[in-house]
UniProtKB/Swiss-Prot annotation:
PANTHER family: DIENELACTONE HYDROLASE DOMAIN-CONTAINING PROTEIN-RELATED, ESTERASE FRSA
Protein name (database record): Esterase FrsA
Similarity field: Belongs to the FrsA family.
Gene3D superfamilies: alpha/beta hydrolase
Known role: Catalyzes the hydrolysis of esters.
Organism placement in taxonomy: Bacteria, Pseudomonadati, Pseudomonadota, Gammaproteobacteria, Enterobacterales
Source organism per UniProt: Escherichia coli (strain 55989 / EAEC)
Keyword Hydrolase: yes
Record's keyword annotation contains Hydrolase: yes
HAMAP family: FrsA (MF_01063)
EC number(s) recorded for this UniProt protein: 3.1.1.1
Length: 414
């Protein structure tokens, strides 16, 4: 079946699909202060989703393309769940968030199929994969249309990997007590085995969202990158996120001695946002298997335990947390109680001495990750490094921060 036909089969025009903003039924606290964050984007009036321009541009999407798709959503006069929120159009049709981003992805998919130059075709496939992932954002459990977009993103990513420089292998890892999980091992040119970074992504992203990190930062230094999806999404959707947040990544780490392309004696973990919760747990529980752990905007304590901090977070992000925990119908009080159990300080880890070198990068006044969380991480490590990343100019400083983090990782791996 061709990719185009697969798209047509998955996205049959039906209007009974649940609309994304209705999937998590929590008590709404009403108006919230505007939020802006380098890693998560910003709240914009009349949008349910946070608009994450920096990360979308960093992944290769043209800013004009973002505005074009947003304009199509805004101009739609189709029925909405909430007339005040543009991105709540009901059903897979014009104006629906998933429809418009998937339609944009199909344009690039068609370009990829028509392009004869393999590398350029690979770029177009990668572009399509990124757009399908934005269509599925924020990846809430039970969002049928989003799951179909994720399937198309994975397919496009596999097509891209066959054409782009280096080698990518799709790998299956066995996890006792449940379904196996699938990861992608990205390898630079040259002969392995390679020093490898195990990527621990955020809760509102997919493992295929981090190709730019590999291509721009790790590959030029001869470092491989291994990704897996976080529990409850993508290829890890059959696994619920629990307080043992690092369970899947631990089983992957333990399997690395049997992967011939990976130098299992030179492995680091890198955690974005809640992925840092996973990475820091690994630093404590699997220190003999890790040379270093780096974190960026870590969610390890304050957001999980401080009610005032939770009140500053947009509804969409709280919906993501509730969805990952399988608490779609829980009260806000029940969600707060459960989130507290995910704090690595409450679990008795952070604050104890950890032998693994740990770096943590942060932005001042980050609503998701205050400086204190990063200080807690680095002060707990026998070899800690704190990295403040200035906010403006946001893109340049984000790139500079990633270069510094990669330098730090490279020194400990190579």
């Amino acid at each position: 079946m061709t990719q185009a036909n697969l798209s047509e089969t998955l996205f049959k025009p039906r209007f009974k699909h649940p609309e994304t903003s209705t999937l998590v039924r929590r008590f709404n606290h009403g108006a919230q202060p505007p939020v802006q964050s380098a890693l998560d984007g910003k709240t914009i009036p009349h949008w349910y989703r946070m608009i994450n321009r920096l990360m979308w541009i960093w992944r290769g999407i043209d800013p004009r393309e973002i505005l074009d798709v947003q304009a199509r959503i805004v101009m739609s006069d189709a029925e909405r769940t909430d007339d005040d929120l543009y991105d709540t159009v009901i059903g897979y049709r014009g104006g629906n968030w998933i429809y418009e981003w998937a339609t944009q992805a199909m344009v690039w998919q068609q370009k990829a199929c028509a392009e004869e130059d393999p590398q350029l075709s690979g770029r177009h496939w990668l572009h399509a994969a990124t757009l399908y992932n934005i269509a599925a954002y924020p990846h809430l459990k039970g969002d049928d249309l989003a799951e179909q977009a994720q399937a198309l993103s994975n397919r496009a990513y596999e097509e891209a990997a066959q054409r782009l420089p280096g080698t990518m292998r799709q790998m299956e890892f066995t996890v006792p007590g449940g379904a196996p999980i699938t990861g992608f091992l990205h390898m630079p040119k040259g002969d392995g085995p390679f020093p490898t970074v195990l990527m621990c992504g955020g809760l509102d992203a997919m493992q295929t969202d981090y190709y730019s990190l590999y291509e721009r930062y790790f590959a030029p230094r001869g470092i491989a990158m291994l990704t897996i999806d976080m529990p409850s999404v993508g290829f890890s959707s059959k696994w619920k996120l629990t307080q043992d947040s690092s369970l899947l990544h631990q089983h992957v780490l333990k399997a690395l001695p049997n992967v011939p392309w990976v130098d299992h004696t030179r492995v680091a973990a890198f955690g974005f946002r809640f992925g840092a919760n996973v990475a820091v747990r690994l630093a404590y529980l699997e220190s003999p298997r890790l040379k270093a752990v780096a974190c960026l905007g870590p969610v390890v304590h304050t957001l999980l335990s401080d009610f005032k901090c939770q009140q500053q977070v947009p509804e969409m992000y709280l919906d993501v947390l509730a969805s990952r925990l399988g608490m779609h119908d829980a009260s806000d009080e029940a969600l707060r109680v459960e989130l507290n159990r995910y704090s690595l300080k409450v679990q008795g880890l952070l604050g104890r001495r950890c032998p693994t070198p740990m770096l943590s990068g942060y932005w001042k006044n980050d609503p998701f990750s205050p400086e204190e969380d990063s200080r807690l991480i680095t002060s707990s490590s026998a070899d800690g490094k704190l990295l403040e990343i200035p906010f403006n100019p946001v893109y340049r400083n984000f790139d500079k921060g990633l270069q510094e983090i990669t330098d730090w990782i490279e020194k400990r791996l190579c």
